[in-house]
Amino acid sequence: MRRRTFLTAGAALGLTPVMGMSALTENTEQKSGEKQQYFEWIRFHLPLGSRQGLVSEYYRDVAIPALNKAGINNVGVFNVKHGPNDPTLHVIIPHPSLESVVTLNDKLLDDNSFVQAGERFLKSPMSDMAFVSMEKTIMKAFTNLPEIQVPTQKKENKPRIFQVRTYESPSLTAAKRKIHMFNEGGEIAIFQKTGLQPILFGEVICGDRMPSLVYILAFDDFEAMNKGWSVFGNDPDWKKLSGDTFYAETVSRINDWIWTPTGFSQI
């Protein structure tokens, strides 16, 4: 039954890609009974020298307070510990709806007090740019983890690192099968059972290198991360799930980063 349902959906997906994906997503959301968040992942490529801290200062002093006032909480801001060498700052903003993703920025910029407070960033001239470039990825939360999670370490004011992984898939139907593996297949539940601490799982609906998904895990440190993955890899339920041929050849490329939170990150 599982394969028959997926093959039918895949046929629709091949004939009408946008409508097929929408139908699958809506069907899953109805089953979950919970409203899924949308995540905005912003990557700032920073200049060298004294201007490198302008983006951090803007989020710390202006953007996060304004977002919280607008009802957007648990905003994460991170530095890269292991990943590309160029200086970057990563921001994760959870939204209650896709409409919020589209409209929030304009609402903030229509507020004169907000623009004045963030003028150094928002109106930075070409001769003194706050960032070199900015990239965005928009994701929809998985049904089995519909909202961003605040890690235990943050709640207890303890150090933490984040492992960020993107899974690229060779086709649209393969991407849907991998998401199915995390949700209905039980992979997220195995993560949680074995002590891995998910922060978010998101299907990329707008961004580069699609089709793909993103997930973020929190750990105390590298030792805890390695230990956690060892427990996961030896779990009987994971061994059974990973051997299921229904989920074979769903991931064509994996990208991996390690982030550390800024002092003002809410995640």
Language model feature labels by segment:
Residues 45-54, 61-69, 74-153, 169, ...:
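Hydrophobic, ordered structural segments
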